[in-house]
Amino acid sequence: MTETTPDDTLIAALWRIIATHGWSGLTMRRLAAEAGVETASLRERFPTRLDLLLLHGRLIDQAVLAGTIPGQGGSVRDRLFDVLMRRLDAMQPYREGLLQLFEDMRRDPVIALALSPHIGISMRWMLEAAEVEAKSCEARLLGLGLAGVWLATIRAWARDDSADMAATMAALDNALDRAERIARSLGLLRGDGEPTISEPVAETS
C-alpha cells in the first residue's frame, strides 16, 4: 500500500473543501483546519490558492511517472492512451471537487487562464511518461497538441459517471486520432507513428 504523505492529506482536504464550498469558499484558514496543519505553514509554501492547484498537478504528474514501466513498448499512440488514462485514474479520488472547480471556472475564466501554461508543462511530462522523444521545439508543439487531447478527454470525463469510463476512453481515442492526423500533416510524426526527431523531451519549463 502506498504511504500517505502530508501533501496527500493536504490535497485531499483541498478537494473536499472545493467540493463542498466551491473555489470561492476555499480559504487558507479553512484548509488549515480541514488538513490539520498550521495556517502559517501554508503561507510559507503557498502564497496563493493557485499554488495549491499547481501542487496537485505536480503530484498527479509524479504518480503517472512513478507508474511508468521503462521500455514499455507499443506504439506512441497506445503509450499516450495508457498515460492519460492513468492520469485520470490518479484524479478519480478527487472527482467531486474537480467537477465543482470546472463549474467555477466557467464563471471565472481567470482560473483557467492562470492554469493553462501549467497544463502544457504537465503534458510535456506526459510525453516523457510515454517515452516520446523530441527536440525541445517539437516537444512544445507535441505538448500543445497533447494538451488539446487532454482537455477534450476531461470534458468527456466530467460527463461520464460510468464505472468503466467507456465514454471517456472513446473520447480519448477520437482525440488521439485527430491529434495524430494533425501531427502527421505538420511532419511531426513518421509513418510508424514515432516522432520525426529523436532527442529527449527534457525541457519542461
Regions found by a protein language model. Give the residues of each.
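C-terminal peripheral helix-coil segments that are non-catalytic and often amphipathic
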Residues: 128, 159-205
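Short, basic, alpha-helical segments at the C-terminal edge of helix-turn-helix-like DNA-binding modules
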Residues: 57-64
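Helix-turn-helix
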Residues: 9, 17-51, 55
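Short, hydrophobic secondary-structure boundary micro-motifs
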Residues: 27, 99-101, 114, 135, ...
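Amphipathic alpha-helical packing segments from all-alpha helical-bundle domains
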Residues: 110-132, 137-152, 170
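Hydrophobic alpha-helical connector segments
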Residues: 68-100, 107, 117
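N-terminal positioning helix adjacent to the helix-turn-helix/winged-helix DNA-binding module
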Residues: 5-13
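Amphipathic alpha-helical interaction segments
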Residues: 30, 82, 86, 100, ...
